[in-house]
């Protein structure tokens, strides 16, 4: 995730994955990767509740294993949940068999039909198998809240610059992203609402 918007060539290589939803609707889809963790995820949930916004959480299996109550709390509050592998494994760096085992092990804990590969990195063969089991959800806008080179103001500016109808927007409920995300998320929601955007969770298909 080195760019705010994924390059056209990469999107063309994986056309059957979901990069954007309902392009004609004035709706955006907030997503949160890498949780759940007790230091950050509850704050995100409370913030979303305060603004009446539903979102989608792509969870790492190891975190769910440690904090199963947070998985249940996310769903209880009306958000959707997706699989983000068991150990935040990057598909481009490992063989298909090993990668699929990691994903399926995570899904024993998460139980979702949505999947997002960490860093958006996936081999074509991995994608082919996973498409038969999951809707693969990529993204239209990466806020880069995790970047130590960006300030919270710059993360917010990424949202303002790149958000559009149907955008799937990536934040992170992680310690690495916490400072920037906590600055940018409420301000991004307020700005998007001012621009007339609605919010929705990605349904677990």
Task: State what each model feature region is.
Residues 43, 102, 184:
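Charged catalytic carboxylate motif
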Residues 27-28, 38, 47-154, 159-177:
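Metal-dependent polysaccharide deacetylase catalytic core of the NodB/CE4 family, i.e.
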Residues 1-31, 36-51, 66-67, 187-205:
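N-terminal pre-catalytic segment of deacetylase/amide-hydrolase enzymes
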């Amino acid at each position: 995730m080195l760019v705010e918007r994924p390059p056209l060539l990469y999107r063309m290589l994986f056309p059957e994955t979901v990069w954007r939803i309902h392009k004609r609707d004035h709706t955006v889809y907030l997503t949160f990767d890498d949780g759940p963790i007790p230091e950050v995820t509850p704050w995100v949930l409370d913030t979303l509740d305060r603004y009446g916004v539903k979102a989608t959480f792509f969870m790492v299996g190891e975190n769910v294993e440690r904090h199963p109550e947070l998985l249940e709390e996310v769903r209880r509050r009306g958000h959707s949940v997706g699989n983000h592998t068991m150990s935040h494994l990057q598909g481009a760096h490992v063989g298909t068999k090993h990668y699929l085992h990691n994903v399926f092990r995570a899904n024993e804990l998460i139980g979702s039909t949505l999947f997002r590969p960490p860093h958006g990195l996936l081999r074509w063969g991995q994608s082919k198998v996973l498409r038969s089991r999951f809707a693969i959800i990529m993204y239209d806008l990466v806020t880069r809240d995790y970047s130590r080179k960006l300030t919270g103001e710059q993360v917010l500016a990424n949202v303002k610059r790149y958000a559009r109808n149907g955008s799937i927007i990536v934040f992170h409920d992680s310690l690495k992203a916490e400072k920037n995300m906590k600055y940018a998320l409420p301000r991004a929601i307020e700005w998007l609402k001012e621009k007339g955007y609605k919010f929705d969770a990605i349904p677990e298909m």
